[in-house]
């Protein structure tokens, strides 16, 4: 039975970074002006054999920030009605405060130094997360300000697919198109996909042992 030593840790595998899968649904493409409407986050953990798997899940429907723009075509695309009281939406600050608290604890528990966002077409999700963090002025944002793991790029390399649906199906992960464009569902599939990509590389012998001294902060 493999021991969970320095090799079989998130810290060692990702160079001190704590990966968190994020998916957002928005009211447009401009993170500075268009509303963030939904966010889901899934933390990851590594077992004693070094296999990556999902851990905790968070999900929030979010109230449009004051003065934000709601692009009609975006709302049609994701099917979100921002005025629906059954969304039980919270403010950006409430959502990010809880998310950042959980992530900070995960960083501490796994002896990492910073979180890194994992997403499909990560630049989009990262831009909205950073914009919301700047608006809410929450101190100590745990996420790296520019580095990400993009499962679209990784899937293109490993699977020859860049669309989330096609990448999941190619990787043997079921995908229900009727549930797509929900932040929670897409985050769950993206997390499964990222774990499969990392674990597949390990199965192929692509992940070699490292020493503690080789792990440096950015």
Swiss-Prot record:
EC number: 3.1.13.-
Cofactor, free-text remark: Binds two Mg(2+) per subunit. The active form of the enzyme binds two Mg(2+) ions in its active site. The first Mg(2+) forms only one salt bridge with the protein.
Gene3D superfamilies: Ribonuclease H-like superfamily/Ribonuclease H (3.30.420.10)
Keywords, comma-separated and alphabetical: Exonuclease, Hydrolase, Magnesium, Metal-binding, Nuclease, tRNA processing
Class in the EC hierarchy, top level: hydrolase
Record keyword Phosphoprotein present: no
Family as reported in the entry's similarity comment: Belongs to the RNase T family.
Protein name: Ribonuclease T
């Amino acid at each position: 039975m493999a021991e969970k030593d320095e090799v079989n840790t998130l810290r060692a595998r990702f160079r001190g970074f704590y990966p968190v899968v994020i998916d957002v649904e928005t009211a447009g493409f401009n993170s500075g002006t268009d509303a963030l409407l939904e966010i889901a986050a899934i933390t990851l953990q590594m077992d004693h054999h070094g296999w990556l798997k999902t851990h905790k899940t968070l999900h929030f429907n979010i109230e449009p920030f004051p003065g934000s723009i709601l692009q009609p075509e975006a709302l049609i695309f994701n099917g979100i009605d921002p005025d629906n009281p059954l969304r039980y939406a919270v403010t950006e600050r409430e959502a990010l405060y809880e998310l950042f608290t959980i992530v900070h604890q995960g960083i501490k528990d796994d002896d990492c130094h910073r979180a890194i966002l994992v997403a499909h077409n990560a630049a989009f999700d990262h831009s909205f997360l950073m914009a919301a963090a700047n608006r809410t002025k929450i101190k100590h944002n745990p996420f790296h300000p520019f580095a990400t793991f993009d499962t679209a790029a990784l899937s293109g390399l490993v699977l020859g697919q860049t669309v989330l649906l096609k990448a999941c199906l190619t990787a043997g992960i079921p995908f229900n198109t009727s549930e797509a464009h929900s932040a929670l569902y897409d985050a769950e599939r993206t997390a499964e996909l990222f774990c499969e990509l990392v674990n597949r590389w390990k199965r192929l012998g692509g992940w070699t042992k490292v020493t503690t001294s080789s792990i440096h902060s950015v």
